[in-house]
From Swiss-Prot:
GO terms for cellular component: extracellular region. It is an enzyme of class 3 (hydrolase). Pathway: Glycan metabolism; cellulose degradation. The gene is bglH. It catalyses: Hydrolysis of terminal, non-reducing beta-D-glucosyl residues with release of beta-D-glucose. Belongs to the glycosyl hydrolase 3 family. It comes from the Eukaryota. Beta-glucosidases are one of a number of cellulolytic enzymes involved in the degradation of cellulosic biomass. Catalyzes the last step releasing glucose from the inhibitory cellobiose. This is Probable beta-glucosidase H. Keywords: Carbohydrate metabolism, Cellulose degradation, Glycoprotein, Glycosidase, Hydrolase, Polysaccharide degradation, Secreted.
Length: 829
């Protein structure tokens, strides 16, 4: 049990140095302790879809939940609350008091590298999902840190870019999810973003931080993103409480100097220290484990499976191709994702999972009597797959000297694969600024032939196989996007190998500062990283031919492919919406021979181009599904779960159609949010542009009827008694299922341009076949309000408001109305 401390007593008695120490982290994950006054260190931990703990390298395995867009696609408050509880319990097992999540930035572009981390393109849906998962997490005693406040909606030059956005768009779109969280959840911490907003970094922008504390009357601990503090004086005076990580770069002795010059007041230091102590006092109540451990329990697996299955969106099901009958005799599974599931995106979302269920294993389990044919068809990886199951006796040795010198071994760590990130690794005597490491292990290939090897590095590295150099990624390097945007491109080498023969693999690695490559706008965590991958060299045309052959033979074909953490990750944005090279050709070739019995399962966190969509009878969007990816997909494909997911973002047919196409990267250090409030479906509806699949879309194996007239009461809007819209919904189909009713508001004509309609409520209802139920959706004052830039306030405009209830943004099934009798202005939440 952590000893208690009195905040006022501590502040009155600690030294100035102790106060200043509180204002920055002690190391990569912890706050400073003051043992004399029983002030403990508080442990923070990533990430958005699972709890990694304190180690990027050789971390303790963890539960991996579906990605943010997958959770958003459930449109299910209760499930998100349960997900939050699971994350909180995982934190406790890892000894962590504070979860660095959720992410609630906006997917203004389908190309954003971290788009998969956030819930939705709509601020209302994003805010409600965030509120639910936060309340679940904090019910365990763990503090949530909602992030990234605000405008970190793309990765390109994220530390340097100046986001130019109108006050109206800032308030109505980008701040709104945080505002909902402030109103409904009051999490204990808020993380600032790396970027600038309208000329000034958020972390040192008093106007932005005052919105939180003065406008919304929410007073969380405000911490920086990791290495996202850029000044001493401005950040402290603006309201940043905690610089992370430690050791400090801008506080400590620099605060002392600024105080001597009276650039920072003593009262400011005390105020910031008080907030840190309040955070520590609250966080220290969490009953965390003394050691980092796992907790892989059956009930957690069941929840993860439910989360995955309920997130899956049935995009297309012509002729009721799905569900596939379990009596099928022969089924073809095609795609590299079949045996290598994409469980998460990259960056802060990466972790070592307890396990990962592949679709192949799940189908074998679901169809014990069927003949299952498998072909990869085309590789979907960007970096060659890491070596793991064919690796044995692997360790990494650490030194302060390069391999050509006489050197002293400082540490040895066992490894289970050939990828490592050392940003938070340390060992006694190791010079973190400049060190070297040697990975050695035994590789036993399972197939004879020519093997491709790929080596990507943040630092420098060379690969030797049986002491023969195969790849040199040290002498000449080309910058790529790996490792948060700091790594090289993948350098490739080849070697002829024999199945069953054991080969000695050796990687000579130099830490980050051994590389001359530098980049603007990316986060330099230090330490370095490397990824060695390998696979049998294959002829792409022959791979497709093999896939076509099994598709032609089978009664049903499932093509499961898409993106993965190589393509969607923190640190870089996608250059286009395309699937990996060769995937579209594979799908088209399979459809040529088996279009009437083929289901396409796409795994990605954000939209991809589907030039073959008009030919496919069945299309399923499966996101990144976490530990239970294979089970979740199979449950839907074979009808054990009736799909109920709805798209949390619009799915454009072409990347050029999206509203940010001309403004999706830093140009001259700035990024113009030229679409203003017209993000996602707001844009497509305003300009009348068709999308491939609309926001809120998702099919079911059953059918529903909704009463065409919504009863809205009271008919006159009052903030003291806001209206509720009520409809009858009936399951008119053959099986139980869930329908999400989405409430959109169409504002009256105004001198201020408004979107055609905006989401302001939703509810998900589960009904047995033939069951009918009355369903109500509450309407709050946000539904009638827009940000008046002249008055600098919210404006609720008089007039008649249309209530449009739909099963997607384009399928409006019920209507009603209410009126606002008098225009009012307001602030706050």
């Amino acid at each position: 049990m952590t000893p208690k401390f009195d905040i006022d007593y501590v502040l009155a008695n600690i030294t100035e140095d102790d106060k200043i120490a509180l204002l920055s982290g002690s190391d990569f994950w912890h706050t400073h302790a003051i043992p004399k006054f029983n002030v403990p260190p508080i442990r923070t931990t990533d990430g958005p879809n699972g709890i990694r703990g304190t180690k990027f390298f050789a971390g303790v395995p963890a539960a991996c939940l579906p990605c943010g867009t997958a959770l958003g696609a459930t449109w299910d408050r209760d499930l998100l609350h349960q997900a939050g509880v699971l994350l909180g319990k995982e934190c406790l097992a890892k000894g962590a008091h504070c979860w660095l999540g959720p992410t609630i930035n906006m997917q203004r572009s389908p190309l954003g590298g971290r788009g998969f981390e956030s819930f939705a393109e709509d601020p209302h849906l994003s805010g409600i999902m965030a509120k639910s998962i936060i309340l679940g997490c904090e019910s365990t005693g763990v503090i949530s840190t909602v992030k990234h406040y605000v405008g970190n909606d793309q990765e390109h030059e994220r530390r340097a870019v100046d986001v130019l956005v109108t006050p109206r768009a800032l308030r109505e779109i980008y701040l709104r999810p945080f505002q909902i969280v402030a109103r409904d959840a009051h999490p204990g911490a808020l993380m600032t973003s790396y970027n600038k907003i309208n000329g000034k970094h958020v972390v040192e922008n008093p106007a932005m931080l005052d919105i939180v504390r003065k406008d919304w009357h929410w007073d969380p601990l405000i911490m920086s993103d990791w290495l996202g503090t850029y000044t001493t004086i401005d950040s402290l005076n603006a309201g940043l409480d905690l610089e992370m990580p430690g050791p400090t770069r801008y506080r400590g002795k620099y605060i002392e100097s600024a105080m001597q010059a009276r650039l920072i007041k003593q009262s400011t230091i005390s105020k910031r220290a008080r907030k840190v102590l309040e955070f520590v006092e609250r966080a220290s109540r969490a009953p965390v484990s003394a050691d980092e451990t796992g907790r892989d329990f059956p009930e957690d697996r069941a929840l993860n499976r439910t989360l995955c299955a309920n997130s899956i969106v049935l995009l297309k099901n012509d002729g009721n191709l799905l569900p596939i009958p379990k009596t099928v005799k022969k089924i073809a599974l095609i795609g590299s994702h079949v045996k290598t599931p994409a469980i998460s995106g990259g960056g802060s979302a990466s972790l070592e999972p307890y396990y990962a269920v592949s679709l192949y294993d799940a189908v074998v389990e679901a169809l014990p009597d069927a003949e299952i044919l498998y072909e990869a068809g085309a590789y979907a990886h960007r970096m060659l797959p890491v070596i793991d199951r064919m690796l044995s006796n692997a360790v990494i040795h650490f030194y302060n000297e390069p391999p050509e010198k006489e050197r002293t071994l400082l540490a040895t760590e066992p490894v289970v694969n050939t990828a490592f990130q050392l940003m938070d690794y340390n060992a006694p005597g190791l010079n973190r600024a400049l060190f070297w490491a040697t990975l050695i292990g035994e590789f036993t290939p399972d197939v004879s032939g020519l093997w491709d090897f790929g080596l990507t590095v943040f630092g420098t590295a060379t690969l030797f196989i049986d002491d023969e150099m195969v790849i040199d990624n040290a002498t000449r390097q080309t910058r790529g996007t790996a490792f948060f945007g700091k790594g090289t491109v993948q350098e490739v080498g080849q070697k002829q190998l024999t199945a069953g023969q054991t080969y000695k693999i050796r990687i000579e690695f130099g830490s980050a500062n051994t590389s001359p490559m530098k980049a603007i706008g990316v986060v330099h965590f230090g330490g370095g990283a490397a990824h060695l991958g390998a696979c049998l060299h294959m002829d792409p045309e022959q791979m497709v031919a093999n896939a076509v052959r099994v598709a032609a033979e089978a009664d049903y074909t499932i093509v499961c492919t898409g993106l993965n953490r190589d393509w969607e990750s923190e640190g870089f944005d996608r250059p286009d919406m395309d699937l990996p090279p060769g995937i579209d050709a594979l799908i088209s070739s399979v459809l040529d021979v088996a279009a009437d019995r083929t289901v396409i399962v796409n795994q990605s966190g954000t939209p991809v181009t589907m030039p073959w969509a008009h030919r496919a009878r069945g299309i399923v969007q499966a996101w990144y599904g976490g530990n239970e990816t294979g089970h979740g997909i199979a449950d839907v494909l074979f009808g054990d779960v009736n799909p109920s997911g709805k798209l949390p973002l619009s799915w454009p047919a072409d990347v050029r159609h999206n509203p940010t196409y001309l403004n999706n990267m830093s140009v001259g250090g700035r990024m113009l949010y030229g679409e203003d409030v017209y993000i996602g479906y707001r844009f497509y509806e305003k300009v009348g542009r068709e999308v491939l699949f609309p926001f809120g879309h998702g099919l079911s194996y059953t059918t529903f009827h909704v009463s065409p007239e919504a009863t809205v009461s009271p008919i006159v809007f009052s903030s003291d008694s806001p209206p509720t819209a009520t409809v009858l919904v009936k399951n008119t189909g053959p099986m139980a299922g869930a329908q999400t009713l989405q409430l959109y508001i169409a504002a009256p004509n105004s001198t201020t341009p408004r979107p055609v309609k905006e989401l302001h409520g939703f509810t998900k209802v589960f009904l047995q076949s033939g069951e009918e139920r009355s369903v109500s959706i509450h309407i709050d004052r946000y539904a009638t309000s827009f940000w008046d830039e002249i008055e600098d306030m919210w404006k609720s405009e008089e007039g008649v408001y249309q209530v449009l209830i739909g099963t997607s943004s384009q399928e409006i099934v019920s209507r009603g109305e209410f009126r606002v009798e008098q225009t009012r202005y307001w602030r706050g939440v």
